[in-house]
């Protein structure tokens, strides 16, 4: 038996080597792209963008809009993820597919759909009253449309992994359904909540297509960091675009790691 185990392990070596090579190639590509940006950028480029009033505004708007979007995404993702995990109903597969649409649709299509919704339907009156399209609310709504889908998917997976037994025990001990949810389910799902919040914030930070179409790219109004990269490239300032890109990478890594 020991000899056969040794032979089996030797025979498994090519399999694992192949996996490591493929994984290393992918990870290496990501690292190479980041290192290329770092090699190209200079400290003076960062000084230049941080001294730019427009870039400072985009940093501020990005942080605020991503934070608001994350709260809204969790507010929606918690009940939706719980319902999709715990309750069986007719048409569930269809609803599940609809929830994935923002993930699979091209970002520009999402932005265009939002623009049509608020400019070519009865919701136009709401847009005229509140000033949504091409204003800051459009930035948040565009981010929310995509980030919430990732949050829903994450929390549904979290609730799927939680055994309903503890919840049932709480119900038998006299808790109402809402009390069991708040006192038992949510505390157990705290890591999933943190993961969903982190993913929603980071995804919102990198959102560009829907914002460009639905909110525009106006300086000092709807300019977030991805839009800043676009505008800097449009005027031929590659150094500034790379510096802003690395700033976004740093912010995303900080959120994901911390």
Where are these regions (language model features)?
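Glycine/proline-centered hinge or cleavage motifs at structural transition points of membrane proteins
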Residues: 173-174, 187
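Short hydrophobic faces within alpha-helices
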Residues: 101, 165-173, 241
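Membrane-water interface segments at the C-terminal ends of transmembrane alpha-helices
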Residues: 10-44, 53-160, 184, 188-209, ...
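Glycine-rich helix-loop "coupling/hinge" segments at transmembrane-helix boundaries
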Residues: 210-238
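Short, Lys/Arg-rich, polar N-terminal cytosolic tail immediately upstream
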Residues: 1-13
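Core catalytic ATP-binding domain of two-component histidine kinases
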Residues: 179-181
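Short coil/turn motifs that cap or connect alpha-helices
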Residues: 90, 175-177
